[in-house]
């Protein structure tokens, strides 16, 4: 498997030893979590943003990815538009508001970025078929994405989803050729079912089990810099598993490492009031979020009670001097429908949380008035229009 010049292997976050790219099940020395590492001195900003980095999709940033674009399993994920939201700019009273519309990825979700990296790594194994089946638990979007990218390699995949998962996710997991198990209950039940129901060994595509899913999320940071010519001041990120916060924060830090920028922006994790383990841990000064005992959010994508990347997300927020806010479901859904009405972009319910978080900041007078603000829309509104429409009907519209 060809690897990029700057990639220095998978480093163990516990003992520091370095393992090859195709290591499975954590650090061979101590079992710790593995993280892609790079020789940053070998990367020039021009490698990322100059003429050689031209192309479509996030693989144009392969100078800071483990594998070259020529090896990528890709459907041109990334290169999503940064849409100026003029009404929101006026209403929030800031310099500029942009929506980074991740709904326009191949399967309509930001998770396509990481899945493309994870499956590219699988393709580089000596015998990818020996890894079958690939499996993960998902609230919906990542399961759909996994089925799509695994299908590209012709590998069998299982997505375990809770029964509440959106119909579009369930249907398209099968349409992409993936196998699906619908598990009664909530997301933790689906997560437990992977081990309970799969009789064989499997290759885990779970976030943070593979070192590559949150790694793929970091290209959001690179694209924001490429499109704005500078970093934004504040980025609102809907938060569930922690992989987006951890990944995007790493992307901002790497831009400092290679000398493209001097400082990182403020990153804000937004969670539902009724399921906010990462926000609660951040507010209480805990390193590791406690599982959320009684989740009750309409937004299934954000109902992750015991996030696999919870500690990583909290750590990233602290490193970047970030913030965390919680928002009511009605505000998230109301924000998503307001954006659809006035800004054209179809935000999913989870994406609406980013807009609701920005409104919360506005109401708390937390903006100074000249910021460039980015709202990350993590999913297409076309995935669950019923949830959005129900919200309007509930208001008599
Ligand atoms: Zn180790």
Question: Positions of the model-derived regions?
Answer:
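PLP-dependent amino-acid enzyme catalytic core
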Residues: 1-397
